[in-house]
Structures are given as C-alpha cells and as structure tokens.
Design a protein with these regions (language model features):
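Conserved ATP-binding N-box helix of the HATPase_c
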Residues: 1-9, 79-102
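Short beta-to-alpha transition helix within the HATPase_c
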Residues: 19-22, 26, 37-58
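Conserved short strand/loop->alpha-helix "switch" segment adjacent to the catalytic nucleotide/phosphoryl-transfer site
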Residues: 64-86
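Detector for a conserved hydrophobic position within an alpha-helical segment of the HATPase_c
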Residues: 160-162
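Short conserved segment of the HATPase_c
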Residues: 130-141
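Short beta-strand/loop element within the Bergerat-fold HATPase_c
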Residues: 105-116
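Acidic ATP/Mg2+-coordinating residue in the GHKL
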Residues: 125
Length: 188
C-alpha cells in the first residue's frame, strides 16, 4: 500500500493519492476499525485483529458481530486474559473445521453485560460441524477426532468456564457449529 502511495506521489498524481487514501481509510474502517470501536480491551482487540489476518490468509472470513461490545472494565484483567485462551481455542478449531471449504466464515460475538454481570462469548462457524455422538466427549482431556496429541484446547476452555461457574453450550450439525459461553463477573 505504501508502494502505491509512493508511486502515485512520484508521478505527481495528487488527486489519485487523495482517492487512494480515502479508499484505504474506508477499507480499514470496514474491515478492521470496527474491532477497535466495539472491543475496548486492547489485548483482546489486538488478538482479534491478528486472527482476522490469519483467517484471511487461509481464505476464511472472520467477522466480529456488529452488536459486539466489550468494555475495558477495571478489575477484569484475569478474566480478559482467560478470554484470550477461550477465543484462541474456539477460533483455531473453527479455522480447522473450515479448512478447504468454500466461503468459510467465522463470526465472533462478545458482550460484557454490566447490568447482569455476565461476559457473553459466541463463536459460530460454517465448517464441517460436530456429530451428536461426538459432542458429549469434546470437553474430555485428550479427546480428539483430529489425531494423537490433540484434544486439550476445549478441555482448557471447559476448565476456565468451570472456574468462573459459567455456562458453555454447543450447538452443531453438519455445516455449522456455535459455541456459547457465559462467564459471570464479580462485582467490585
């Protein structure tokens, strides 16, 4: 992008420079800017930006739901750090389930409900899905349908959810999966 700007400046095409900068600004806001507007926790916003780029390199569309709102509330640093683990596992698993699929899509929804003191996290994908007979085992340590030395991520997510006396729900069928996690937050 800088090469384009440099070239346009060297050619003294200043009107084109202006147009290109406007395009970049709109493109940035459309694809990335909304993350920093709705996700106010810097570590989580940065992590999601990195995952959006990683997904794009794999041909997958990773979107943050436009209704997401994660405020940077004081005293929740540990919870936010554990949210990074949860998001990492769920997004990585989603990317693996989509691998090779056309029009792969992942949608992440995060919401800190300060009235009910709940952090809500949803991750949806249109990957291969999880069959009903395997759903009951996905949180067991070491259980995996992907081979040996796997099956620790969802167990870690389950451990975090239990630590906070939260809830985790999985809805899956062929072609789509949604993980929904509710984590109660302590009032200060």
């Amino acid at each position: 992008k800088l090469h384009v700007l440099h070239g346009l400046i060297e050619m003294k095409s200043y009107d084109e420079v202006e147009k290109y900068i406007a395009y970049l600004k709109d493109d940035y806001h459309e694809k990335i800017g909304y993350i920093s507007e709705s996700i106010k926790v810097p570590a989580v916003a940065g992590f999601l930006l990195a995952k959006v780029r990683e997904a794009k390199q794999k041909g997958i569309s990773l979107l943050i739901d436009s209704d997401s709102m994660l405020l940077n509330k004081e005293g929740l640093d540990e919870l936010y750090n554990e949210l990074l683990i949860i998001l990492g596992v769920l997004i990585d698993n989603s990317m693996e389930s989509i691998s090779g699929e056309n029009d792969g899509k992942i949608i992440v929804y995060l919401y800190l409900n300060t009235e009910e003191n709940i952090l809500l996290c949803k991750v949806y994908d249109n990957g291969c899905g999880i069959s009903k007979d395997k759903l009951e085992n996905v949180f067991e340590r070491g259980y995996s349908t992907k081979g040996e030395n796997r099956g620790y991520g969802l167990n870690a997510v389950d451990t975090i959810v239990k630590k906070y006396n939260g809830l985790i729900d999985v809805e899956s069928e062929v072609g789509k999966t949604t993980f929904t996690i509710e984590l109660p937050i302590e009032e200060e």
